[in-house]
Amino acid sequence: MKFAIVVNINREDALELAQELTSWLQERGLSYVLDSVSGEKTGIEPSMAMEELNKDCDAFISLGGDGTLLFTSHYSVTKPVIGINVGHLGFLAEFSKAEMFEAVEQVLNGTYSIHVRSQLEAEVTMNGGLKHLTALNDVVIEKGAYPRIPTFIIKLDDELLSAYRADGIIIATSTGSTAYSLSAGGPIIAPKSNVFVITPICPHMLTVRPIVISDDKTIQISVEAHGGEFPLNCDGHVSKMLLPGETIIVRKSEQIINLVENKNRRYCEILRSKLLWGHEHQSGS
């Protein structure tokens, strides 16, 4: 088995962990390769372009946090991904540094379990043709530098849902419900729920609320405004600047992400830890 290793190069502890991991793999005669950016920063060989890793490797190891794992997921396709969190417990990167070798051994022995995560697909026009962008967490359209409040026209399966006056619109998966959508007032959705959530960002009216829809719906979004350009973000990365009247289509992607499950963690435990639920009770006990 060959592992692809992706490192958060901006964290010293992640770089150190990469040295530990590759030494451990070498001692056991196991194959690995880093993406070219991680390889250059760590000085570890071999390395190759991120786009080539999936064809050459059997599993991915992400060293960093949820952001690093999100980045890795865009290239892993259906290969299993081990998320090692070098900081605090993550929603996606479930394994701690101390659990890293155990996680790798589970994959080697075939004794691991998988969290299958759905993705979003955004269909947009780019460079004169259609392009399909994927997002594990969310697809977001924001007002950007536009000085007024734009109107976001949203249709579900060609039926008008509403015209939202807001600073932006978030379309999130159940996985992404604990990310930007949660900060904007959206609900927490259990990972295996077959739904998406549409969450307005700072809506103009108090009656505008997030709405949960089944993931078999097709969502059409366009922006009404007098000029301006509006950033389209997929998992936090600006993919395109939308013009007024331009329509994007968001639906469930056929591509899934396979995250290696930490059997020592439970979903409710992760929620309590990350969101400090019951923290006062624990402090007072």
UniProtKB/Swiss-Prot annotation:
Subcellular location, record wording: Cytoplasm
UniProt entry tagged with the keyword Nucleotide-binding: yes
Documented EC number(s): 2.7.1.23
Main location, first listed in the record: cytoplasm
InterPro entries: ATP-NAD_kinase_N, ATP-NAD_kinase_PpnK-typ_C, NAD/diacylglycerol_kinase_sf, NADK
Needed cofactors: a divalent metal cation
GO terms of molecular function: ATP binding; metal ion binding; NAD binding; NAD+ kinase activity
UniProt entry keywords in alphabetical sequence: ATP-binding, Cytoplasm, Kinase, NAD, NADP, Nucleotide-binding, Transferase
Function: Involved in the regulation of the intracellular balance of NAD and NADP, and is a key enzyme in the biosynthesis of NADP. Catalyzes specifically the phosphorylation on 2'-hydroxyl of the adenosine moiety of NAD to yield NADP.
HAMAP family associated with the record: NAD_kinase (MF_00361)
Name of protein: NAD kinase
Organism expressing this protein natively: Prosthecochloris aestuarii (strain DSM 271 / SK 413)
The gene coding this protein: nadK
